[in-house]
């Protein structure tokens, strides 16, 4: 099995708050037919906003892909905003999201808040060129995929070849998205490589560091930089 050496677990994640269960806020909307209650993510989906706020696995990928396809069918011309705060996860699940982002008709605006690590950083870089963003205090981290191999020698060899293929595939796409030379990218991803939002912009992973004046408005298209 190949993972992007994640979900990355920050040593800071152990500092309190572990026993608090996640609560999804509800919002109430008034209409001529009365009140309707929505969970906040469903309400934001109506504004073409998708949240990736968990590790990336098959279930999460299915949900994100379904939302992308729905919004593509609803309006192929209007931008989709994908907010990312993810430690990464399954390479295969992440590539399912990535390929869908590349194939649908609307521009996908990617926005990092918090942490985009491993596959999270890869998806961040895969947004529409000129429309990849991060909040000022965000952290972005890239590294190479890691997979475990077990079984007979021939099985280990097959899995090792797959890991090398995935590593080369991801690096090739990161070269395309960042403009960095392959040699530098290979060197940087040998270990966890952390960047601030400004450093990620200089590296080519994102195009803008968000400030209040350029905060994306879901009601209007985002102006591409570059």
Swiss-Prot record:
Gene3D superfamilies linked? 2-enoyl-CoA Hydratase, Chain A, domain 1
User: Main subcellular localization, coarse class?
Assistant: cytoplasm
GO molecular function of the protein, one example? ATP-dependent peptidase activity
Do you know which Pfam families this protein is assigned to?
CLP_protease
| Active site, per annotation | 118 (nucleophile), 143
List the disulfide bonds in this chain. Answer: none
* Catalytic activity as recorded in UniProt: Hydrolysis of proteins to small peptides in the presence of ATP and magnesium. alpha-casein is the usual test substrate. In the absence of ATP, only oligopeptides shorter than five residues are hydrolyzed (such as succinyl-Leu-Tyr-|-NHMec, and Leu-Tyr-Leu-|-Tyr-Trp, in which cleavage of the -Tyr-|-Leu- and -Tyr-|-Trp bonds also occurs)
The answer to keyword Protease applying to this record is: yes
Q: Where are the transmembrane segments?
A: none
- Which EC numbers does the record give? 3.4.21.92
Localization, per the record, is:
Cytoplasm
Q: Name one GO cellular component term.
A: cytoplasm
Keyword list (alphabetical) reads: Cytoplasm, Hydrolase, Protease, Serine protease
**A GO biological-process term:** protein quality control for misfolded or incompletely synthesized proteins
Q: How does it assemble?
A: Fourteen ClpP subunits assemble into 2 heptameric rings which stack back to back to give a disk-like structure with a central cavity, resembling the structure of eukaryotic proteasomes.
Role, per record: Cleaves peptides in various proteins in a process that requires ATP hydrolysis. Has a chymotrypsin-like activity. Plays a major role in the degradation of misfolded proteins.
Q: Which family does it belong to?
A: Belongs to the peptidase S14 family.
Task: State the protein's name.
Answer: ATP-dependent Clp protease proteolytic subunit 2
Q: Which organism is it from?
A: Synechocystis sp. (strain ATCC 27184 / PCC 6803 / Kazusa)
Q: Which gene encodes it?
A: clpP2
